[in-house]
């Protein structure tokens, strides 16, 4: 299909793999695909995978496959990990998994963010990114807004909250139907969430 950029989780059925085991796993993926255009973004999400993709692994893989291992999405929420990888592997395109880290990550050379809440608040996240380079005073104001938005949303189960917001603002009840085991956000919680974020003047549009 022509898609060469891939966000790749570690294999997480067996827990506590060694660094060498993870190196072998990603090496197998790259060697078997055997395509010079392949670009892999390591996906660190230990809360779900149970595996931390640490700086030692990133250093080894980026040295072994400099043209294939090109980025890292850090959904751990651990700023120390994000910062350490940017310092030790500056050639890696870093994408924190929360917009709360956007401005300070850009300060250290990050490429941007890949954030779930960006699905419902894309415009403000984009504006914050652009203002960082063009209008620092504006970027500070916008960063506070996206911080407040994220903080409000993550008080609830994330997917349920995001789909509830899309249902409400698009007036489309189809968004309240989630695949099990996920469930729709209770109406009272959705009402409270809307009251929290309405003053932030966000938009579903990018």
What is each stretch, according to the model?
Residues 1-52:
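Active-site beta->alpha loop and helix N-cap motifs at the rims of alpha/beta catalytic domains
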Residues 12, 77, 104, 176, ...:
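Flexible, active-site-adjacent loop/turn segments at secondary-structure boundaries
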């Amino acid at each position: 299909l022509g898609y060469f950029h891939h966000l790749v989780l570690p294999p997480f059925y067996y827990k506590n793999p060694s660094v060498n085991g993870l190196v072998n796993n990603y090496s197998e993926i790259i060697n078997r695909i055997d395509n010079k255009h392949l670009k892999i973004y390591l996906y660190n999400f230990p809360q779900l995978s149970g595996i931390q993709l640490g700086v030692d692994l990133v250093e080894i893989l980026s040295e072994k496959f400099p043209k294939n291992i090109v980025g890292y999405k850090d959904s751990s929420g651990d700023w120390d990990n994000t910062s350490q990888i940017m310092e030790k592997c500056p050639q890696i395109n870093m994408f924190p998994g929360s917009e709360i880290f956007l401005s300070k990550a850009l300060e250290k050379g990050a490429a941007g963010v890949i954030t779930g809440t960006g699905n419902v608040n894309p415009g403000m996240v984009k504006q914050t990114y652009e203002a960082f380079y063009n209008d620092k005073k504006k970027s500070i104001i916008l960063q506070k807004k996206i911080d407040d938005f994220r903080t409000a949303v993550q008080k609830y189960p994330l997917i349920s909250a995001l789909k509830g917001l899309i249902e409400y603002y698009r007036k489309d009840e189809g968004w309240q139907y989630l695949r099990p085991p996920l469930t729709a956000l209770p109406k009272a919680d959705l009402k409270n969430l809307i009251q929290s974020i309405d003053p932030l003047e966000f938009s579903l549009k990018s």
